[in-house]
């Protein structure tokens, strides 16, 4: 069954688009409710202004930037998503008639997950990028990436594939074509807008804008802000995020960036994309990350569709089951792997403590089910959270749902209470807390904040929890230590899913120094990324410590 047959709309073909020209709503103007406008003439004027009917596809080239959503060192005002190396020789081909998009760029290898393009989707514990040239492709419900020119295609998970397909249409021509598709149901309104504080100066004269919203794939509500020149300057929607819920997603384009390509076609050269609200001083959130992608792409080839994007058989056949492997690494201590991110369950006399709730709710529900099978009839009383990167906290709400108390560093507390563990809307991918919210988050025993150290104990078994610093990677990092078992449990400080490094990293040395300062007796290190290994393997990486 195809993407379109599954209820995501009709195939995006030129024939379909021609069948549905913009038409004014056959109602008298006064029959629209107050505040609403007829979207037909607005969309038709915008399409005429930029020559949408004359553009079937486009290839753009330039230099871009990539923001790693959820990988900031800390959550605070004016702290954006971290940016890595530029996306050099960036090329994007968008073929709206076929519903396909190709992106390619050069980026230094060895620093980023191979599966990560930009914005959402950064996952530690996954294979690193090995080659400079990267390609990302989407055709309908299928998406994949290629790490280097001769590499095998690797299928993208459904959440990434859906976002890449949506992104094909979040641009001026894409939006106007999508507005003609069956089920789009355009609606329009208007408002006055002033310039942005701090960017556009002390603007006092507002501009009247029209906003047209459409429905895409029966799921996403997408709106475009159109100015008096009939140019689309902002295209906005929401996308699902395991941590933040319904997440702001938008592209912005200035009037000056539109260039004339001939045949009545105009296309923007400057792209500015937000994943997260572009508002450093909003009151409802702590996190201020927003710049996920952008750049100048001023080499534009209209109606250059390039080769067809054919879905590889391996991608078409790919599945993404949630698999949990379990191993008892010490009496009552269970490693729960089978994914890019692990969890560890520790049995106490009358409760269970779990270290780490990564990725998303689906993963953590499977882990919780495995724990219940391993240790029946005891409550999961505590969830120890190592740090606040998105790929490590996607299951916090799942543990809140089952009644666990979350132990985290005090630097993470305000971000969690304001942005993550809340009653915020989650309409695109409802989770357990949004479907069955607890009576009162404010009165529940949901948090323990750690400053320097914390101990969980039943009188026989102890779990010591320590603040790890300094770190350039993140602030608010915790590690767990089981003294009786001589086990250290840590995240991102020493990973074993890849070949061990030839020389120690700064994070490796911070972990080593922490263990030395605290005089911990360690036999086994249990990373969140990778399998447990003897402490001696870690010391081999650290090397000569006689001078330390």
What are these regions (language model features)?
Residues 31-41, 119-221, 239-247, 311-315, ...:
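Flexible, processing/modification-adjacent segments and terminal tails
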Residues 45-48, 52-150, 186-197:
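N-terminal mature ectodomain segment of secretory-pathway/periplasmic proteins
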Residues 203-309, 478-483, 490-491, 496-516:
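Gly/Pro-enriched, hydrophobic low-complexity segments
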Residues 13-26:
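Bacterial N-terminal signal peptides
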Residues 362-407, 517-521:
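Active-site metal-binding motif and surrounding structural segment of the metallo-beta-lactamase
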Residues 282-349:
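Zn-dependent metallo-beta-lactamase
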Residues 327-371, 477-495:
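Conserved beta-strand hairpin/beta-sheet module of binuclear metal-dependent hydrolase folds
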Residues 512-548:
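Divalent-metal (often Zn2+) His-rich catalytic cores of metallo-beta-lactamase-fold enzymes
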């Amino acid at each position: 069954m195809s993407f379109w047959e599954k209820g995501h709309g009709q195939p995006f073909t030129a024939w379909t688009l021609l069948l549905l020209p913009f038409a004014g709503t056959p109602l008298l103007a006064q029959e629209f409710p107050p505040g609403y406008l007829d979207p037909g003439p607005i969309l038709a004027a915008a399409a005429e202004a930029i020559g949408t009917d004359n553009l079937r596809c486009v290839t753009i080239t330039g230099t871009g930037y990539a923001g790693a959503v959820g990988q900031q060192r800390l959550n605070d005002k004016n702290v954006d998503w971290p940016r890595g190396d530029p996306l050099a020789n960036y090329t994007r081909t968008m073929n709206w008639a076929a519903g396909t998009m190709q992106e390619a760029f050069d980026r230094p290898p060895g620093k980023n997950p191979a599966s990560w393009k930009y914005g959402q989707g950064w996952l530690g514990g996954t294979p690193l990028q090995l080659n400079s040239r990267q390609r990302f492709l989407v055709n309908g419900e299928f998406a994949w990436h290629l790490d280097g020119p001769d590499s095998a295609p690797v299928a993208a998970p459904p959440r990434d594939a859906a976002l890449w397909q949506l992104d094909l249409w979040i641009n001026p021509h894409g939006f106007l074509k999508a507005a003609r598709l069956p089920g789009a149901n355009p609606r329009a309104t208007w408002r006055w807008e002033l310039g942005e504080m701090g960017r556009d100066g002390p603007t006092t004269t507002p501009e009247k804008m029209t906003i047209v919203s459409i429905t895409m794939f029966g799921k996403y509500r997408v709106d475009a802000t159109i100015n008096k020149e009939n140019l689309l300057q902002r295209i906005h929607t929401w996308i699902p995020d395991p941590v933040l819920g319904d997440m702001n997603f938008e592209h912005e384009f200035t009037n000056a960036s539109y260039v004339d390509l001939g045949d009545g076609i105009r296309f923007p050269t400057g792209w500015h994309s937000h994943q997260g609200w572009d508002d450093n001083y909003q009151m409802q959130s702590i996190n201020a990350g927003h710049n996920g992608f952008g750049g100048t792409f001023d080499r534009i080839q209209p109606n250059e569709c390039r080769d067809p994007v054919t879905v590889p058989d391996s991608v078409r056949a790919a599945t993404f089951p949630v698999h949990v492997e379990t191993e008892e690494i010490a009496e009552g201590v269970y490693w729960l792997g089978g994914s890019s991110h692990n969890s560890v369950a520790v049995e106490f006399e009358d409760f269970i403590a779990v270290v780490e709730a990564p990725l998303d709710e689906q993963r953590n529900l499977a882990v919780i089910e495995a724990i219940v099978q391993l240790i029946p009839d005891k409550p999961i009383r505590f969830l120890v959270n190592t740090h606040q990167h998105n790929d490590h906290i996607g299951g916090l709400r799942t543990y809140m749902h089952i009644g666990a108390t979350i132990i985290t560093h005090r630097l993470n507390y305000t971000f969690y209470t304001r942005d993550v563990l809340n009653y915020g809307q989650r309409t695109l991918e409802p989770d357990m807390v949004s479907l069955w919210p607890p009576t009162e988050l404010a009165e529940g025993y949901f948090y323990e904040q750690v400053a320097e150290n914390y101990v969980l104990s039943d009188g026989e078994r102890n779990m010591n929890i320590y603040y790890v610093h300094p770190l350039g990677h993140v602030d608010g990092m915790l590690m767990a230590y089981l003294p009786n078992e001589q086990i250290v449990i840590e995240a991102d400080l020493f990973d074993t899913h890849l070949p061990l490094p030839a020389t120690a990293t700064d994070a490796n040395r911070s972990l080593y120094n922490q263990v030395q300062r605290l005089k911990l007796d360690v036999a086994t290190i249990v990373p969140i990324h990778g399998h447990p290994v003897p402490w001696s393997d870690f010391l081999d990486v650290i090397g000569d410590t006689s001078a330390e």
